[in-house]
Amino acid sequence: MKRVSQMTALAMALGLACASSWAAELAKPLTLDQLQQQNGKAIDTRPSAFYNGWPQTLNGPSGHELAALNLSASWLDKMSTEQLNAWIKQHNLKTDAPVALYGNDKDVDAVKTRLQKAGLTHISILSDALSEPSRLQKLPHFEQLVYPQWLHDLQQGKEVTAKPAGDWKVIEAAWGAPKLYLISHIPGADYIDTNEVESEPLWNKVSDEQLKAMLAKHGIRHDTTVILYGRDVYAAARVAQIMLYAGVKDVRLLDGGWQTWSDAGLPVERGTPPKVKAEPDFGVKIPAQPQLMLDMEQARGLLHRQDASLVSIRSWPEFIGTTSGYSYIKPKGEIAGARWGHAGSDSTHMEDFHNPDGTMRSADDITAMWKAWNIKPEQQVSFYCGTGWRASETFMYARAMGWKNVSVYDGGWYEWSSDPKNPVATGERGPDSSK
């Protein structure tokens, strides 16, 4: 009898384990209303471009479900178990709380499998996902962050969403000679050396006359759509932000830069930059948008205000003064009264703003990160870093998010620290330090 009872108990235990597994596999689909009633969370498994607002088909729905998180299946091979667990913790997902996935079957299955391995037990399908366009959320200006297939389709002459209104150009931006460009670049792309838009001693933007000459050289008018990309996104963003300051109306970034194009397996070419017909008539006075670039006194005027934020886009070690972040910048510290807007692990990384594939993190994540330091969309906000690259990338993201009164303090820490009379802060501190 004892042997029988042991076998029975084992069978029951195995049955319960299987039932638990099947429950996870076959959780009943939920509508968005049902999910919200259970205080659950929706997870969008599509690439971030579609989450942000790009329709997957020409006339398809645009955006993501209300309060949905984005965990793209395409990121999973770039996320370790520890990174996924950190993502789950950051978004406050409980192992026994319901989550509902949506996307194509393959992506949903891949994300479900990883979440199950991470310990989530109540995973279902969002049965009415993307069925009501009126309730979908999206970046106000998602079109300013293009994705590889969209750009390829544009180059092929296909109909695309948010098509440029007139002439358009694709340009790679990087510092120095086009070494990597020569080996492989997006077909038809021009090349801009960042030395054409900024110069020593402080690496501030060049004069307006020099900007005019640079734009003419590359055949750019104020009404030319310019699509920029870089091996480093912030190099392209630096050029993009300066072009907007000059007056180019429609400037876009390839979200994630060159790496996303390469990962997509799209065509490339090699060789020198193409010959470009000069365009001497920019069409408007430069700068057409001077408010996008602040000088030191204008930046100083934003400090210690509740209706404004001067925002440091530097790593935490830079912010607290343990490193300057640059071999050529000796002073350490931060502008006293500046608010920390996050950046990355050091002066050459921007992980705090990137998904695992290098694309922009969700607007909800970025907004929450900034809100903790009293950086809000209704304020006048100016970003700075060491010399302008990281600040420019952040500016482009804020612009896509619909923040209306944003700019870059061009001189940044390099300029500020060069004047010993300017107040400097060091050491560990929190948001209250900027009041």
Curated annotation (Swiss-Prot):
CDD domains: TST_Repeat_1, TST_Repeat_2. Residues 36-138, 164-270, 304-425 form the Rhodanese domain. One of its GO terms (cellular component) is periplasmic space. Gene3D superfamilies: Rhodanese-like domain. Pfam families: Rhodanese. SMART domains: RHOD. Substrate binds at R390. PROSITE patterns: PROKAR_LIPOPROTEIN, RHODANESE_1, RHODANESE_2, RHODANESE_3. Keywords: Periplasm, Repeat, Signal, Transferase. It is found in: Periplasm. InterPro entries: Rhodanese-like_dom (IPR001763), Rhodanese-like_dom_sf (IPR036873), Thiosulphate_STrfase_CS (IPR001307), TST/MPST-like (IPR045078). Its EC number is 2.8.1.1. The active site is at C385 (cysteine persulfide intermediate). It catalyses: thiosulfate + hydrogen cyanide = thiocyanate + sulfite + 2 H(+). GO terms for molecular function: sulfurtransferase activity; thiosulfate-cyanide sulfurtransferase activity. Residues 1-23 form the signal peptide. In vitro, YnjE can be efficiently persulfurated by the cysteine desulfurase IscS. Monomer. PANTHER family: SULFURTRANSFERASE (PTHR11364:SF27), THIOSULFATE SULFERTANSFERASE (PTHR11364). This is Thiosulfate sulfurtransferase YnjE. It comes from Escherichia coli (strain K12). The lineage of its organism: Bacteria, Pseudomonadati, Pseudomonadota, Gammaproteobacteria, Enterobacterales.
